[in-house]
Structure formats: structure tokens, C-alpha cells
């Protein structure tokens, strides 16, 4: 349509950032962009994960398939995954074999020779590539208990039992299998816009104000110790339950508090599995989203693009 523009200039403000956790604000955009970013982070940012397992010896109580499943779900450091090739696209091995450009080999050999149970963990996997290794959670742990730093348990062996195998990690995305998803949790919420009618609030007694505040299941409101006025303490604690609004109506004060979501402002919470740092996960997702949009813009097959993306696809090709 003439005169319609989709152009926006989103802004990002980081609130909290750790290796495995990020919280940030995404503003000046709409829910379609927020949801697209969330979905890309969960299912389309590539990582490395164990895909093939050749078991040579297994005398543990676990069958081969169970061990292979456990191995596949061990998160691997994947900073290099974006530059590696998918096995089906690898020109050096044609996807039938494996090479350094698309795969990483992990041999494992463990045998229990004492009466004490031997824990076989992710630390017993030896990587052929030092940039792709089982995630070490030691740096993220605040406890000094050494038992917390032994890695992810694969199997337990008793005297005489042995486990020997070769595992092959390949590049993939969460859309194909959850083992390749770098995200433990990705959520976003609308920022609430909370408006208090001060004139109506002044007509309430102190007891009524306390009842109003306590009607909210989360601590959104409080009383200013100096002025005695009801104030917003933590707007993001609001869960859109409308309990405080219903309470105001029950008190005969409709419109006392109005709460509306800001449809162009979102608060994201991102937790990583450890395969990627949370910050890198977000940046990689943005890069992939850009590539998808560029593919629409540069599409030669306009009919196919229009079928898939309709007016938006046509608009982007026109610039």
C-alpha cells in the first residue's frame, strides 16, 4: 500500500549480563520483531552437539542407546560453530565422512579397577579440537564443594566394567533437534504502563490503601514513607492479573489504577545452556535474523517471496 512504511529503529539497553544470563530492554519495535528474535535464539542459532556414537566396549548397566542419548545432550562450547560447515554442505567430506571443517571427534575410554564406583563424566571426553569441549560449569558455580565440579555423569562403573567409545560432534540447529539449542530459556514481557489517579487515591483511608496494595499477588505497589502516597515500586513485577484493578472496582473506585502494556517495549530474559555466552547467543541471533531479511530483499524469485511473505516481502525488495 502506498505510504505504508515498516521502517523502525529499535534500541537495546542491557540491564544485566553474565556468561549464562542476560536481561535487556528492546524498544521502538513491535511484537513481530520481538517474537522473531526469541524464536531464532531458541531454534536457529547453530551449536555443536554429539550426533554419532560408535561404542566399542560397554559392560555398564546402561544400554548403548541410553548412553548415546546422554552424550548428545551434553552441551559443548560452540563459539566456532557459526564459522563451521553443516555436514551435508561440507565440500571436503561430502557429509559421508567427517573432517575438521564440519565435525569434532571425542574419544572416551574408562574402566573401573577398584571396589569404589567410578563416575564416567563429560570430563572424560577428550576433544580433538580445543575450541569445542564439554562445557565447564565450574566458573559459573559459587559453591566450593568439589563434588559440584566433576562434570555431567554419563555412566557409573563397578569393578571390571568398561566403557569405550568414539563420539562425533556436528553442527546443527535447535529446529532439527533440541540438543543443538543454545538456549535454556528465552522469554520476553511487555513493559507495563501504570497510571495512578492521585485525586481518587487521596480519597482513600490508610487502611484502604493497604488493602489495595495487598490485593496484588506481586509487590508492584508500596506506600511512600514520607508522603504516605501509593507509589509504583516494581512495575515489572506486574503479571497482568488485573487483581488490583478488580479491587479498585470493588471499592467503588473504577479508574483508580490503569495498567496498559507498552506495545513497543519489551524486557527480554535469556539463559544459555553454556554452549554460547548469553551475549553471543543474542548477537548470533541478530546476525541470523539479518541474513533472513537480506534473503527476502535480494530474492530473485518474486513469486515465491510473495507467496511466503506477501506485502512485507514486496516492500523489502523495493527498499
Curated annotation (Swiss-Prot):
Pfam family, one: RNA_pol_L
Xref: InterPro entries: DNA-dir_RNA_pol_30-40kDasu_CS, DNA-dir_RNA_pol_insert, DNA-dir_RNA_pol_RpoA/D/Rpb3, RBP11-like, RNAP_Rpo3/Rpb3/RPAC1, RNApol_insert_sf, Rpo3/RPB3_RNA_Pol_subunit
Keywords: Acetylation, DNA-directed RNA polymerase, Nucleus, Transcription
Annotated SUPFAM superfamilies: Insert subdomain of RNA polymerase alpha subunit (SSF56553), RBP11-like subunits of RNA polymerase (SSF55257)
GO MF term set: DNA binding; DNA-directed RNA polymerase activity; protein dimerization activity
Localization of this protein: Nucleus
Coiled-coil features, chain-numbered ranges: none
Residues with PTM N-acetylmethionine: 1
One GO CC term on file: RNA polymerase IV complex
GO biological process per UniProt: DNA-templated transcription
Matches recorded under CDD domains: RNAP_II_RPB3
HAMAP family linked to this entry: RNApol_arch_Rpo3 (MF_00320)
Function according to Swiss-Prot or TrEMBL: DNA-dependent RNA polymerase catalyzes the transcription of DNA into RNA using the four ribonucleoside triphosphates as substrates. Component of RNA polymerases IV and V which mediate short-interfering RNAs (siRNA) accumulation and subsequent RNA-directed DNA methylation-dependent (RdDM) transcriptional gene silencing (TGS) of endogenous repeated sequences, including transposable elements.
Subunit structure: Component of the RNA polymerase IV and V complexes. Interacts with NRPB11, SHH1, GRP23 and NRPD1.
Family under the similarity heading: Belongs to the archaeal Rpo3/eukaryotic RPB3 RNA polymerase subunit family.
Protein name: DNA-directed RNA polymerases IV and V subunit 3B
Gene: NRPD3B
